[in-house]
């Protein structure tokens, strides 16, 4: 196997796909030729990043795995934090969670809030708190409101 080049990355499973299983071959081949990382994206109707990153980790041993980018505003921070921690451990520390603004027209179409820089900053803060073992109950900020509720 050639020496991996950490500064060289590829975009895995580009665009729309008929079969997400194609990613398994792409990742194995990228690792074989010495590519340092694979970046994975989401498409609301055909690609879900949590599944793809776990699959990439399962078929590689040295390839870095990153989202470029994930639609963080469509997931609860608890779900995103659990996903990030799980794939980080599953991959032996090779996972990086990339978040970004996405496309307003898609969020408008599904009724999700548009992403702002303030929301992204707040979301990252929530992830850091969760990864430190803290709670987000009672949080009320740009990334969302997570009140503490006992019963209903």
PLM regions: where:
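Short amphipathic alpha-helical segments at helix-loop
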Residues: 37, 68, 108-112
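Alpha-helix N-cap and loop-to-helix initiation/capping positions
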Residues: 18, 22, 48, 75, ...
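Ser/Thr-centric signal marking residues that sit
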Residues: 60, 67, 74, 80, ...
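Internal, glycine-rich beta/alpha segment that forms the wall or movable "lid"
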Residues: 2-3, 79-152
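A short, GP-enriched loop/loop-strand-helix hinge that lies immediately N-terminal to
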Residues: 64-70, 96-97
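Active-site-proximal loop/turn and secondary-structure-junction residues that shape catalytic pockets
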Residues: 14-16, 44, 71-73, 101-105
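N-terminal beta1-alpha1-beta2 module of alpha/beta enzyme domains
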Residues: 1-67
């Amino acid at each position: 196997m050639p020496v991996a080049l950490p500064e060289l990355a590829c975009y895995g499973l580009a665009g729309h796909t008929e079969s997400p299983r194609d990613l398994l071959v792409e990742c194995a081949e990228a690792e074989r030729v010495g590519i340092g990382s694979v970046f994975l994206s989401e498409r609301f109707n055909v690609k879900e990043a949590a599944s793809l990153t776990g699959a990439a980790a399962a078929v590689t041993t040295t390839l870095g795995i990153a989202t470029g980018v994930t639609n963080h505003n469509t997931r609860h921070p608890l779900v995103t934090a659990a996903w990030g921690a799980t794939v980080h451990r599953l991959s032996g520390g090779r996972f990086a969670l990339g978040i970004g603004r996405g496309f307003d027209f898609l969020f408008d179409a599904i009724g999700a809030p548009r992403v702002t820089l303030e929301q992204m900053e707040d979301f990252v803060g929530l992830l850091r708190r969760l990864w430190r073992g803290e709670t987000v109950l009672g949080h009320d900020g740009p990334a969302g409101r997570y009140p503490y509720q006992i019963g209903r």
